[in-house]
């Protein structure tokens, strides 16, 4: 076979494979409700690619830049210790909020490999404005440069800082909620577990399509399709980066992944929301089931036709996503009402 013919055959194979991928993508996207279709669905990204990750690290923090009028945003730092660096925080509050009142520690998403607290400016300032509470965002260290337990430790130290400074911050320590989205939701769940073990009060956990179980990577056919925003390839890279090694069936490191904890007894009430097209849907449903089985009140919302991150893309544009976020706010508001 001549070189020209070999290249021609190779080109035909690549073209055929590309056509098959495009066909599969369009077939998968056909199940997404028309109101939830967004250009992001047509641009699958592999965050295992260093160049893609570098660009995303610059772009993602800008996605939530808008701050609600009347909300003051300030930078704070959890002091460094002999073994840990300082942790940068953003606080959001209105001038007239009730003191002492409730507080939300909110942990951003990004697979533990992307993101920053400021990407949640719009969401955190909305909560501060509408509920009149203090919101604290955490700039935790990212993987793979900083594998476990770096991000977990940073978020737990932020919770301890919130408790230690509750009086100065105008916060009731009995009204502190921990929450987050995606990887931030998974970190929130492990922080809540550690807080329970160390006697640090947490009122409620607000988990938005949380990334809870590294063993999802080990499944041959993870729930959902590889074409919806957060893909199996990105999930595999993110867990490898966070764990510092590929996931294994057995991993006894405490707080490594929320779903690995055997005993969920005594954890605070929870709200878990996820879309039925989200790769995390099965692990989130299972965690909610186990919380309930352990005696913890847990409201589970599984949104039909919703893929990972759809609410952030379409809040205020698609009624279903506006309702999803409103449900989160309602759950948080109810949790912060004193008994």
What are these regions (language model features)?
Residues 62-63, 120:
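N-terminal glycine-rich cofactor-binding segment
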Residues 58-62, 78-80:
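Short linear interaction segments
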Residues 1-6:
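Feature marks short, highly hydrophobic, charge-poor N-terminal signal-anchor/signal peptide-like helices
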Residues 7, 11-32, 43, 47-51, ...:
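Alpha/beta-hydrolase superfamily serine-hydrolase fold, recognizing
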């Amino acid at each position: 076979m001549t070189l020209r013919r070999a290249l021609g055959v190779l080109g035909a194979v690549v073209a055929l494979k590309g056509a098959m991928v495009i066909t599969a993508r369009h077939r998968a996207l056909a199940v997404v409700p028309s109101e939830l279709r967004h250009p992001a669905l047509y641009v699958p990204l592999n965050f295992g690619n260093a160049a893609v990750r570098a660009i995303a690290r610059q772009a993602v923090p800008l996605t939530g830049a808008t701050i609600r009028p009347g909300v003051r945003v300030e930078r704070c730092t959890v002091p460094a210790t002999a073994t840990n660096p300082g942790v940068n925080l953003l606080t959001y509050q209105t001038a007239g909020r009730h003191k002492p009142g409730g507080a939300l520690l909110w942990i951003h998403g990004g697979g533990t490999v992307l993101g920053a607290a400021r990407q949640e400016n719009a969401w955190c300032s909305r909560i501060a404005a509408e509920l009149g509470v203090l919101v604290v965002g955490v700039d935790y260290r990212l993987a793979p440069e900083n594998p476990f337990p770096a991000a977990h430790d940073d978020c737990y130290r932020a919770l301890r800082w919130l408790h230690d400074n509750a009086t100065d911050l105008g916060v009731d320590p009995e009204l502190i909620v921990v929450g987050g989205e995606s990887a931030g939701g998974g970190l929130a769940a492990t922080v809540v577990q550690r807080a329970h073990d160390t006697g640090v009060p947490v009122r409620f956990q607000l988990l938005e399509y949380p990334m809870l179980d590294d063993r999802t990577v080990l499944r041959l056919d993870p729930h959902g399709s590889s074409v919806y925003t957060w893909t199996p390839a990105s999930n595999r890279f993110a867990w490898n980066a966070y764990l510092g090694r590929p996931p294994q069936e057995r991993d006894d490191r405490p707080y490594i992944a929320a779903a690995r904890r055997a005993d969920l007894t005594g954890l605070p009430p929870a709200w878990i929301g996820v879309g039925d097209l989200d790769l995390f849907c099965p692990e989130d449903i299972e965690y909610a089931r186990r919380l309930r089985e352990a005696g913890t009140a847990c409201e589970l919302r599984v949104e039909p036709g919703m893929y990972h991150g759809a609410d952030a893309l379409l809040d205020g544009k698609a009624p279903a996503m506006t309702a999803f976020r409103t449900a989160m706010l309602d759950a948080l508001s109810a949790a912060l009402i004193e008994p």
